[in-house]
């Protein structure tokens, strides 16, 4: 048996995660984020089922902006739960969402680069890619800092970049390095 590890506390909207706080329940909508009413209704059903936070996909800037309308619709229905924006492939959508929601989930494997099989990078090109990714991430970090928005880094095997796949393969090390 492993000793119990007490993590630090993270504030997500009106909820605290970690420390001695209870495990929090989160789910994700499957509605089209452009359908505001359907997404608000699904969020309300999730809250009524016990969710304390709801994740909503924001594939583009339009969907990221719609998060404000979803948040407003939830507030009108008496639900002020933390919303989480789920972002893939679109750093600008993440930046827009970070000014609206309480938490942004990004995947480093597809935040700013897509998978292109067969690409092998030299050490110099690999390091240039890392710097390019860092440059794309800095504006998001600044917006999150200004708004008190939490960032969740979520990685999985299905979204490792070419840079990672060619260096580490589809391995746990690749997920960590991602």
Task: Give the predicted meaning of each segment.
Residues 2-56, 61-83, 87-178:
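Alpha/beta enzyme core
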């Amino acid at each position: 048996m492993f000793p119990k590890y007490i993590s630090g506390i993270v504030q997500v909207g009106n909820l605290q995660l970690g420390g001695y706080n209870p495990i929090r329940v989160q789910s994700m909508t499957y509605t089209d984020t452009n359908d505001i009413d359907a997404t608000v209704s699904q969020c309300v059903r999730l809250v009524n089922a016990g969710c304390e936070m709801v994740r909503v996909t924001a594939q583009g800037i339009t969907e990221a902006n719609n998060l404000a309308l979803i948040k407003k619709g939830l507030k009108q229905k008496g639900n002020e739960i933390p919303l989480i924006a789920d972002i893939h492939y679109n750093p600008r959508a993440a930046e827009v969402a970070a000014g609206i929601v309480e938490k942004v989930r990004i995947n480093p494997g597809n935040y700013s680069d897509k998978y292109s099989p067969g690409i092998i990078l030299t050490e110099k090109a690999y390091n240039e890619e890392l710097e390019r990714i860092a440059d794309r991430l800095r504006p998001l970090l600044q917006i999150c800092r200004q708004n008190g928005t939490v960032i969740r880094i979520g990685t999985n095997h299905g979204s490792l970049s070419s840079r990672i796949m060619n260096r580490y393969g589809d391995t746990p090390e690749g997920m960590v390095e991602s």
